[in-house]
Structures are given as C-alpha cells and as structure tokens.
A protein has these predicted regions:
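ANL superfamily adenylate-forming
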Residues: 1-24, 131
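Conserved ATP-dependent adenylate/AMP-binding module captured primarily in the ANL superfamily
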Residues: 8-13, 53-70, 101-115
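Conserved AMP-binding A3 loop
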Residues: 28-52
C-alpha cells in the first residue's frame, strides 16, 4: 500500500480513526526467534523497546540523514529488529537485497551511494571475495562504514576490509 495512492483501501470513506491511549509499554510487535540459543519463541517488543533500540543504534553508529543504508541481515536478526526504525526516524534511505551476494552488494553500494551497513562475517567475506574480481575502483572507498554482527570478525578480516575495500 502507498499512502496517498491507496487511501480509499486503507481508510474507506466515512471511517474515522479510533481513539486510543498511548502506552509506551504496550506490545508493538511480536518477533519470532530462530531458536539458536533456546527453543524458538515469540518475543513481545514494546513501543519503548523500539524507541530505545532505535535511538541506541543511531547514536552508536553515528547515523545521520545523509547516510544510505544497505540491509544485508535478515529482518528477524536483532539488528534487523531495530535498525529500520532508527533509519526511518532519521529519514535515511534503505536499500534491500533479495539475497546476499558479494558482487550485488558492491553494485548496490555503487548504484545507491551506500554509506552504512551491518553484516555477518560470512557476508563480509563474500564482499571481499567479490572485490577480487571487481573491475575498476571498489565502490564506497573512504565512505562505507560497516558493523559486523553475529560473531566477532577475525582481525585479518577487519584488516582486509580496511585495506582492500577502503571501508571502515
């Protein structure tokens, strides 16, 4: 649905917004875990959880409205739960991948002017591998910042990202 284009579907004529009481502790979403550390479960996320998480992400990552974000993590990952809210709150454009592919990530960085992403170590390795056969200058040099999540990246990988990609 697109606001402005699909208003008749979203709010039929004659309807009006229903009154509601604001409650920062009310459940906003239920996110389902994959069960990597325990049995899978639905986790209730409150409006306050979302706000606090978004604010923390934005401050920690140094995000501004001049950034362009590339999603490489699944939306069910903990960064996937919080980062879209931080980005939307700042007005940051968000670029989404259908599947993780190192060369496609480099293309999106080049095409969309990506400045920031979060990625698992395996994704970083895929980008490093794709960069070896990339023709021309690596896109995003001295512009892209990356937060690696899911597991600590090996020191050699960090050094390669800085040296070969020019990313921070």
């Amino acid at each position: 649905f697109v606001l402005g284009d699909d208003d008749a579907i979203l709010a039929p004529e004659g309807s009006s917004p229903q009154p509601w009481e604001r409650d920062e502790n009310a459940t906003a979403t239920i996110n389902y875990t994959s069960g990597t550390t325990a049995r899978p479960k639905g986790v209730q996320i409150t409006h306050r959880n979302i706000w606090t998480n978004a604010l923390t992400f934005a401050l920690h990552a140094g995000l501004t409205d001049r950034d362009v974000y590339l999603h490489t993590l699944p939306m069910f990952h903990c960064n996937g739960w919080g980062m879209p809210f931080a980005l939307a709150g700042l007005g940051v454009p968000q670029v989404v991948l259908r599947k993780v592919d190192g060369a496609e990530i480099l293309r999106r960085v080049e095409t969309h002017g990506v400045t920031f992403m979060c990625a698992a170590p395996a994704v970083v390795n895929a980008v490093l591998e794709a960069a070896q056969s990339w023709e021309g200058e690596i896109p995003g040099r001295d512009r892209v910042r990356i937060i690696v999540a899911g597991a600590p990246p090996p020191t050699k990988t960090v050094a390669r990202v800085e040296a070969e990609l020019g990313w921070e």
